[in-house]
Amino acid sequence: MKLSTKVTELTNIIAPAVAACDVALWGIEFAPQGNRSLLRIYIEALPEEQAQNKQVTIENCAAVNHQVSGILEVHDPISGEFILEVSSPGFDRAFFSDEQMHAYVGQTVSLRLIQAIGEGDKKRRKATGTLNSIDATSLKLTATDGEQFEIALSNIDKANLIYEDA
């Protein structure tokens, strides 16, 4: 889950504006699309508010949109027109860093891998299962078919939480 140089640049510009709105930056997606790009910002309630079961509101999203729009006008890091979207990460949230997964040990995740794992006919580049543990270099996953994997974090292209209704 390596961030592009452009996403890193945008994160550095946007993070202070998001923090000024009393919410946490979960992640950024940037997709150049011809002459119009898409910038999607995911925000989350601050940890102390999450502990009180508070969540991101539409008002939070609107405030971040307003703040970030102003910052982007000044810094102008995106050439051409762009669409700005601000949202919560949702139940099936994408992980933008390895560190974000630590809070979800014991839950179901979906991984898209750079290189296939497994043996013979069971080789796969996608894996879904229970996240058993994660450390600085790898994670352990029990796939939905019961197979156990240790996967290098550097082999993960994309990771998402899979929401399961309790």
From Swiss-Prot:
User: Which InterPro entries does this entry report, sorted A to Z?
Assistant: Ribosome_maturation_RimP, RimP_C, RimP_C_sf, RimP_N, RimP_N_sf
Give the transmembrane ranges.
none
Where can this protein be found? Cytoplasm
**Biological-process GO terms, alphabetical:** ribosomal small subunit assembly; translation
> What keywords were assigned to this record?
Cytoplasm, Ribosome biogenesis
Q: Which GO terms describe its cellular component?
A: cytosol
Source superkingdom: Bacteria
In terms of NCBIfam families, this protein maps to:
PRK14631.1
What does it do?
Required for maturation of 30S ribosomal subunits.
Protein family according to the UniProt entry = Belongs to the RimP family.
List the protein's name: Ribosome maturation factor RimP
Identify the gene encoding this protein: rimP
